[in-house]
Amino acid sequence: MNIYDQLQAVEDRYEELGELLSDPDVVSDTKRFMELSREEANTRETVTAYREYKQVIQTISDAEEMIKDASGDPELEEMAKEELKESKAAKEEYEEKLKILLLPKDPNDDKNIILEIRGAAGGDEAALFAGDLLTMYQKYAETQGWRFEVMESSVNGVGGIKEVVAMVSGQSVYSKLKYESGAHRVQRVPVTESQGRVHTSTATVLVMPEVEEVEYDIDPKDLRIDIYHASGAGGQNVNKVATAVRMVHIPTGIKVEMQEERTQQKNRDKAMKIIRARVADHFAQIAQDEQDAERKSTVGTGDRSERIRTYNFPQNRVTDHRIGLTLQKLDTILSGKMDEVIDALVMYDQTKKLESLNN
């Protein structure tokens, strides 16, 4: 099947989806309705571009016809030639865009994410850097119009982040932030360093797609849920009513503790969101590890401990080691202006996928 047959098949399926989504039987089936809605949303951009491409093809045909019929009218002929030139350039652009749009899509790209950041090697300095990363992602989310909600956080004695869990919601969040998982290294002079020596510390980032209950159902028998009193600074109990929730997925040992909210039900709901994402991610990671050979063509190895990026403060430099990108814009990037880095990662990933399809 050539590219045009593929595109026509996508458009035909898109129109079929529109009819299915107005079918009362489909509307009443929540799981199927969500699956079809997601499929329609995932193909919408491709169909829109394909329809615009067909209009450009028609414009080229009309312009060529106009040139034939314009004998004796130099002004009309010149206008038609200019339109033909512009349309041919647009045709080439659409063909490149459509090739990329036809690449196999990550089914998680349109999802919200659970973001986890932890201070790793480097003690207090690592925790402070984890806080810097949290601020960077919060500010980037603002530029994208996303909602950023801290669900759980643990702060150390110097105000750094030992661990933070956040939900980032909005349009195509996972598609842009999925490349952030891995070890982020910082090189800078700590505030406590009296001799001006540069120290190296590390924070780790984990990005997981939000998993809806209809997509991944955890058997209640596999969960152990403990209710306890939330604790404040110094460990004292801050609530007379037990509202904090500890949730353990028994088969994997994955544990979530939640006490940010004032009610037990809200803490339970948030804990369930996180544990569902972590358990689904755990099994997805196992499946991906079994397909290592296929994943070498994409950005990085997928190893969660892989050092993906270095932030060098003395040189105001950020280096992404996976794609060899170096930018002397550390201050700009940490202020949330991450587009240049993320766009480069997306382009690299798409290029590698195109190459693998052509080989």
UniProtKB/Swiss-Prot annotation:
Cellular localisation: Cytoplasm
PTM description: Methylated by PrmC. Methylation increases the termination efficiency of RF1.
InterPro entries per the UniProt record, alphabetical: PCRF (IPR005139), Pep_chain_release_fac_I (IPR000352), Pep_chain_release_fac_I_sf (IPR045853), Prokaryotic/Mito_RF (IPR050057), RF-1 (IPR004373)
GO CC terms in record: cytoplasm
Alphabetical UniProt keywords: Cytoplasm, Methylation, Protein biosynthesis
Pfam families: PCRF (PF03462), RF-1 (PF00472)
PROSITE patterns (UniProt xref): RF_PROK_I (PS00745)
Keyword Cytoplasm: yes
Molecular function terms from GO: translation release factor activity, codon specific
Principal localisation: cytoplasm
Residues annotated with N5-methylglutamine modification: Q236
UniProt key word Protein biosynthesis: yes
Family per record: Belongs to the prokaryotic/mitochondrial release factor family.
Function of the protein: Peptide chain release factor 1 directs the termination of translation in response to the peptide chain termination codons UAG and UAA.
HAMAP family in UniProt: Rel_fac_1 (MF_00093)
Annotated protein name in UniProt: Peptide chain release factor 1
Organism whose genome encodes this protein: Streptococcus pyogenes serotype M3 (strain ATCC BAA-595 / MGAS315)
Designated gene of the protein: prfA
